[in-house]
Structure formats: C-alpha cells, structure tokens
A protein has these predicted regions:
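Short, intrinsically disordered or compositionally biased N-terminal tails of bacterial proteins
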Residues: 1-8
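Conserved RecA-like P-loop NTPase ATPase core
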Residues: 18, 74, 224
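Intrinsically disordered, acidic Ser/Thr/Pro-rich low-complexity regulatory segments
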Residues: 79, 86-250
Length: 250
C-alpha cells in the first residue's frame, strides 16, 4: 500500500477538497480536470486553483498528462482519498440524486440475491448486479471457484483502448484466484489501487473486494475490478453491502 505520511502532515483542508473534486469530476468525465472548472466550483480565481493544483502535484497526488492542460489523479491521490473515506476524516456532501442512486442499487442487489434459493445462483446474481451497477468487471471466489462477469463491459471503458492495458488486465485475471487463495486479504473491505495490485502492478486498475463468510469457505470474496478512475465512495459501499448480503443468505 502507498505510504502517505508526508502528505497527511502537509496538505490543507482546501487542497483536500480540491483533490476530492478532481477525483469525482474525472470519474464522471474521464477527461483531465482544468483550473477553470475547479474555480467555478470553489468560487475563486483560476490562478488560485492553479497554485493549489501545483501544490497537489508537488505532493504526488495529481499529475498533468502530456496532451492536456488539466490534471488527473495519481495512484497516491486515489489512495489518500480512499484512506480518508474509510476512516471518516474526509466527509463530503452527498446529493439527493447520489443518495437515491445508491439506495436503488442496494435494493436491486437485495431483491436479486434474496430471491435465489441456491448458493451458486445467488453468487452469480450478486456478481451480475455489481457489473450492472458499477460498470466494472464483477468477480467472486469461494474456495477454488472463481466467478467472473462483465469482461466485455470493462473493456468498453476509455482506459482500455490501449491493447497493452488489456493484456495487463488479462494477466491479472489469470492469476487472481490463486493469489486470493494464498494471500487471503483479511480486511472486511480491501482496496488495491493501480501499482498496489501485487499481481498486476502495470495493469492500471483497481481491485475492490469484500471478504465474507460462507458455508463453503471462510475465505470468500466478492468485488469488482475496473480502471483506477472510479466513484470509490459508491463502489466501495456497494461491494461492502453485497458481501454482507451474501453472508446473511448463504
């Protein structure tokens, strides 16, 4: 996992808020985020935003693609954001639209899983639901069995226009089940961002998995794999909820 001790000590509250907005804007648009866009959101001048962006870039949290004047989050930026989501140090206003979208998602998961009397069908429905709700590849492992869904959907994301990235993801998937079996990530929710993926450091994807108990294995996992450009707050919540639902019904 990326170490961010210096960042925690040096970043200001406004810089945290700007980083959050860059991450959320980039997740929606897949386009580098410029200072003019941020200036409108924060009600300050573009020059002020450019100065704050320069500081975030110096801290390694955002970067400037060669072909754009805007900025994109780095793996370290995503890690800082996710860490603060998990420990509650960074709280953001959720729009009514976002709240209702999440509630519809959890309801859809509950209905689809709870209606299944057989474990295999429930797991497949859970994986399919995560694919539909997040646009990522959905996966689950129970013992030595791996469930996958949504590979074609994953590769429609703009990040995977590059065949090199597709090949890196394919290699990661080939080794995913053996790695989960051996490494057995122990947290209820595990997030591996970009270079943190031990079996796919160059794949530029994030793996978000929830560990859950089942009658078949005490090391069962369900989650998603997708580009590092994610709506982490929503996806993490949906993955955690799905794992909890499977624990209840299996």
């Amino acid at each position: 996992m990326l170490v961010l001790y210096n960042v925690v000590m040096e970043i200001t509250e406004r810089q945290k808020e700007i980083l959050c907005q860059i991450i959320e804007e980039y997740a929606e648009t897949a386009s580098p985020v410029g200072s003019v866009t941020m200036a409108k959101l924060f009600g300050v001048s573009p020059a002020t935003i450019r100065a704050e962006m320069a500081r975030l870039e110096a801290l390694g949290l955002i970067a400037q693609p060669h072909t754009s004047a805007g900025r994109v989050p780095t793996d370290a930026g995503y890690r800082f954001y996710v860490n603060n989501l998990e420990n509650g140090a960074m709280t953001f206003e959720k729009s009514e639209v976002a709240r209702k979208s999440f509630e519809r998602g959890t309801h859809a998961i509950e209905v689809r899983i709870a209606s299944q009397s057989q474990a295999d069908a429930a797991i497949r429905r859970a994986v399919d639901s995560l694919v539909e709700l997040t646009g990522n590849l959905g996966l689950a492992t129970i013992g030595g069995q791996l469930y996958l869904s949504g590979i074609s959907q994953l590769f429609t994301q703009p990040e995977f226009m590059d065949t090199r990235r597709v090949q890196a993801v394919a290699k990661l998937l080939d080794n995913l089940e053996p790695w989960l079996r051996e490494a057995a990530p122990g947290e209820p929710l595990n997030i591996f961002i970009g270079q943190e993926n031990p079996i796919g450091k160059n794949s530029e994807v994030s793996l978000i998995i929830s560990k859950f108990r089942s009658p078949f294995s005490d090391r069962s996992y369900i989650g998603v794999l997708g580009p590092t450009r994610q709506n982490y707050s929503r996806v993490m919540s949906l993955v955690r909820y799905t794992g909890n639902m499977l624990e209840e019904i299996l």
